[in-house]
Amino acid sequence: MVQLRPRLSRIPAPAEAMVDEDQAASEEEEAEHGLLLAQPSSGAAAEPLDEEEDADDEAPEELTFASAQAEAREEELRVRASARRDKTLLKEKRKRREELFIEQKKRKLLPDAVLEQLTTASEADIKKSPENVKVNLKKKSEQHAKGRNSKKVKVQKVQSVGQIESYMAVRLKDEDLRDSRQEAAKHFIHSCLYGSDSKRTTVNKFLSLNNKRSPVKKAAAQFLTSTWGAQKQQNAKRFKKRWMAKKMKKKTYK
């Protein structure tokens, strides 16, 4: 089913009717607003409002200068007391460590009887030979005086009182120069004798080349030395015999 709405008339309504309608609408709105204000609010919604009002009404606690100063002093005293406690704890730990270290040393040390024997022996040696010690000290002092007076000597000998070995004082610059010169000389000799320009070969190669190039063919000379082992000497002799036998066969066939 289709519902048809009535068409509005195009004739304008009178002004009095328009004013009456506006007044009626405004009166209805005021009545609704008044009803809403008159309705009592629920308890759950009213409680937070009351709490907020109470919190706003409460004033901050008053703190006098004397009370603030007393609190600051108390905090300072607490900090100092904690620092003192830490220091005392550290001292106790150090004392314990020292005690343990001393105990460990005592365990590692020799027995008292052996220590007494060593001390008595050292004292007896010192009593017997005080003159020798004085003589040695005098000699060493004289040697030091001579070393100071001698300006021409470049190398000085330094001897300590409790050491027997002597040490030589040398400049490192001189050592470096000497080493560099020696290396340069070695390099020059090697380049002259065994460089790319030098025509150096072994004796066997030189003789073999001459024998090959000469019109009269000869055997490649292979010298025997006493430094070789017996096996090398035997091998050289066999090689020579074989070579001679081959040459003799070739001549007979010709």
Curated annotation (Swiss-Prot):
Where are stretches of biased composition, namely Acidic residues?
Answer: 18-31, 48-61
- Report whether Phosphoprotein shows up as a keyword of the record: yes
Transmembrane feature ranges: none
Domain of life assignment: Eukaryota
Keywords, ordered alphabetically: Isopeptide bond, Nucleus, Phosphoprotein, Ribosome biogenesis, Ubl conjugation
One GO location term (cellular component): mitochondrion
Q: Which residues carry this modification: Phosphoserine?
A: S129
The cross-link Glycyl lysine isopeptide (Lys-Gly) (interchain with G-Cter in SUMO2) sits at K127, K157
> Where the protein is mainly located, per its record?
nucleus
| InterPro entries assigned | NOL7_C (IPR012579)
According to its UniProt entry, one GO biological process term is: maturation of SSU-rRNA
Location(s) in or outside the cell: Nucleus, Nucleolus
Q: Where is the composition biased (Basic and acidic residues)?
A: 71-90
Region Disordered, residue ranges = 1-90, 235-254
- Indicate the family of this protein: Belongs to the UTP16 family.
What does this gene product do?
Functions as part of the small subunit (SSU) processome, first precursor of the small eukaryotic ribosomal subunit that coordinates the first two steps of ribosome biogenesis in transcription of the primary transcript pre-RNA and pre-18S processing. During the assembly of the SSU processome in the nucleolus, many ribosome biogenesis factors, an RNA chaperone and ribosomal proteins associate with the nascent pre-rRNA and work in concert to generate RNA folding, modifications, rearrangements and cleavage as well as targeted degradation of pre-ribosomal RNA by the RNA exosome.
Q: What's the subunit arrangement here?
A: Part of the small subunit (SSU) processome, composed of more than 70 proteins and the RNA chaperone small nucleolar RNA (snoRNA) U3.
Name of this protein: U3 small nucleolar RNA-associated protein NOL7
